[in-house]
UniProtKB/Swiss-Prot annotation:
Chief location category: membrane
Natural source organism: Tatumella citrea (Pantoea citrea)
GO annotations of cellular component type: outer membrane-bounded periplasmic space; plasma membrane
Protein's name according to its UniProt entry: Thiol:disulfide interchange protein DsbE
Cytoplasmic side: 1-4
Gene: dsbE
Domain called Thioredoxin: residue spans: 39-177
Disulphide-bridged cysteine pairs: 80-83
Ranges in the topological domain labelled Periplasmic: 26-185
CDD domains found in the cross-reference section: TlpA_like_DsbE (cd03010)
Family annotation (InterPro entries): Periplasmic_diS_OxRdtase_DsbE (IPR004799), Redoxin (IPR013740), Thioredoxin-like_sf (IPR036249), Thioredoxin_CS (IPR017937), Thioredoxin_domain (IPR013766), Thioredoxin_ResA/DsbE_sf (IPR050553)
Residues spanning the membrane: 5-25
Protein's job: Involved in disulfide bond formation. Catalyzes a late, reductive step in the assembly of periplasmic c-type cytochromes, probably the reduction of disulfide bonds of the apocytochrome c to allow covalent linkage with the heme. Possible subunit of a heme lyase.
Any one of the GO BP annotations: cytochrome complex assembly
Length: 185
């Protein structure tokens, strides 16, 4: 009887070790929440009414995003170190004619304006989402996140994390080219 009681902690330990090992393997092979496709891909941009970042009181709705041509909606904040890392590349894309709309997310308006004045402003339009409601409606995990929106206001792609030259070339640019061509037809 005593021998059986001694084996109970060993069995419990082995079960716990097996569960931990399973969880580590599960996370290592692709259960990364940033890789989840947005539930909004293929659907219109959520209805919103937000102020301009630089001009409080000047309101914009989702209709401001629709002009027949695709755009990138970039969710960013000054408290986000990865946003700083991607900012220079966003400036480069804007210089190449890519329409980028900024969504300043849960941030301090004054700090955000100073950031753009210091680092450059790649945004054709800057929206202020101080309470994060549009971010919530978009299913944003955090900043940065970038959405490709076609000329009709339909979300076609979501990227969580740094939008850099490699991500642009491999993932976003082919879709950008596709929806730009459709806008021309």
């Amino acid at each position: 009887m005593n021998k059986k009681i001694l084996f109970i902690p060993l069995v419990l330990f082995l079960l716990l070790a097996a569960a931990l090992l399973w969880q580590f393997n599960r996370n290592a092979d692709g259960d990364d929440p940033t890789l989840l496709e947005s539930a909004l891909v293929g659907k219109p941009v959520p209805v919103f009414k937000l102020e301009s970042l630089q001009n409080p009181g000047q309101l914009y709705s989702q209709k401001a995003l629709i002009n027949g041509k695709p755009l990138l909606l970039n969710v960013w904040a000054t408290w986000c170190p990865t946003c700083r890392a991607e900012h220079e590349y966003l400036n480069t894309l804007a210089e190449k004619g890519v329409r980028v709309v900024g969504l300043n997310y849960k941030d301090n308006r004054v700090k955000a304006i100073n950031w753009l004045n210091t680092l450059g402003n790649p945004y054709a339009l800057s929206l202020y989402d101080g309470d994060g409601m549009l971010g919530l409606d978009l299913g944003v995990y955090g900043a940065p996140e970038t959405f490709l929106i076609d000329g009709k206001g339909i979300i076609r792609y979501r990227h969580a994390g740094d939008l850099n030259a490699e991500v642009w070339k491999d993932e976003v640019q082919p879709l950008w080219n596709k929806y730009s061509k459709l806008a021309e037809d």
